[in-house]
Regions:
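N-terminal Rossmann-like NAD(P)+-binding domain of SDR-like oxidoreductases, especially those catalyzing
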Residues: 1-172
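Glycine-centered small-residue hotspots that permit tight backbone geometry or close packing
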Residues: 8, 36-38, 50, 81, ...
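Short, flexible, glycine-rich and Lys/Arg-enriched loop motifs at helix boundaries
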Residues: 38, 170-191, 201-222
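The catalytic Tyr-centered alpha-helix of NAD(P)H-dependent dehydrogenases
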Residues: 127, 138-145, 184-192, 223-227
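C-terminal substrate-binding subdomain of Rossmann-fold SDR/epimerase-dehydratase oxidoreductases
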Residues: 194-330
Length: 330
């Protein structure tokens, strides 16, 4: 297959590109490098620097790269906090960018897309594990834009026959098993890399926000999914569409939750480092428990997480962070 990966220099995008190429596919990457890293792009991928909001730039890729079978769309801003203080940035980049992409896809006859969505579309869950049919009531602008992007695909399919798969995933984590690429955000907002930065000494401590939740140890419980397993799900979704599969939405998670304290303790075990912990008050909007039901993805796509053990997930992340303490920076 020949696949165009938008946002292919980012964390999940770059791992998906690696997985695609390791599976023998031809890959074209389009990224503006605002948050992505050129060093994360697989050397065998064809790279174009460009902004999705610029129609001529994405048109140019479709015109130069004949025979693209499908698009995988990761290109979006994704910081929850920033989305609340600068919502217009998220409407511009996430929604406007996707609108321009769809215009170009329709014009060039590209009719299959796999979309990187999020558990943030659900907001405060009514139950766990969360099913794809559960209500979507986002509690932040990031989740709202992702929900709106899903609706754009729905209506564009009705008008133009474009088929899509939307993958709503939970807490992405870990790194490529080789240690060549991994997670490098600035600022870092995800739990596991923050814990590992504290283990490295590049961060003074890890804060636990809330110790009085109705959970076994009082801290929030989340569903952690290895980035390589997410990458594999995107490939399976493309193959599903290539075989004529109908448009659909799938959750991606391990279906097992770990508390913040459990993740910290496992990181101490893996790294053999002392990690300073500071207990703080709850953050508003943090649900006590978020766990996905991924039964639908397993049944329909044939997806099965390969790295479903928390210790293994943290080991791959630690391999990356311990050899790249400054991420992709020299």
């Amino acid at each position: 297959m020949k696949i165009l990966v938008l946002g292919g220099a980012g964390y999940i995008g770059s791992h998906t590109v690696y997985r695609l190429i390791e599976s023998g596919n031809e890959v074209v990457v389009f990224d503006n490098l605002e948050t992505g890293h050129i060093e994360a792009v697989h050397p065998k991928a064809k790279f174009y620097k460009g902004d999705l909001r610029n129609r001529s730039e994405i048109d140019s890729v479709f015109e130069k790269e004949k025979g693209i079978d499908a698009v995988i769309h990761f290109a979006a801003n994704s910081l929850v906090g920033e989305s609340m203080t600068n919502p217009l940035k998220y409407y511009d980049n996430n929604l406007n960018g996707t609108e321009v992409l769809l215009q170009s896809m329709v014009a060039h006859g590209i009719d299959k897309i796999v979309f990187s969505s999020t558990a943030a579309t659900y907001g405060e869950p009514e139950r766990t594990p969360i099913l794809e049919t559960d209500p979507t009531n986002p509690t932040n602008c990031y989740g709202e834009t992702k929900k709106s992007m899903e609706r754009m695909f729905y209506w564009v399919e009705k008008a133009h026959g474009l088929r899509y798969v939307s993958l709503r995933y939970f807490n992405a984590c870990g790194a490529h098993i080789s240690g060549k690429i991994g997670e490098a955000h600035n600022p870092e907002t995800h739990l596991i890399p923050i814990i590992l930065q504290a283990a490295q000494g590049t961060r003074d401590h890890i804060s636990i926000f809330g110790t009085d939740y109705p959970t076994s140890d009082g801290t929030c419980i989340r569903d952690y999914i290895h980035v390589t397993d997410l990458a594999q799900a995107h490939i399976l979704a493309v193959e599903y569409l290539m075989k004529g599969g109908k448009s659909d939405i799938f959750n991606l998670g391990n279906g097992v939750g770990f508390s913040v304290r459990e993740v910290i303790e496992k990181a101490k075990e893996v790294t053999q480092k002392d990690i300073k912990v500071v207990e703080e008050s709850r953050r508003s909007g943090d649900p006590a428990v978020l766990i996905a039901s991924s039964d639908k993805a397993k049944t329909v796509l044939g997806w099965k997480p390969e790295y479903d053990d928390l210790g293994t997930i943290i080991k791959t992340a630690w391999k990356w962070h311990s050899t790249h303490p400054n991420g992709y920076s020299k």
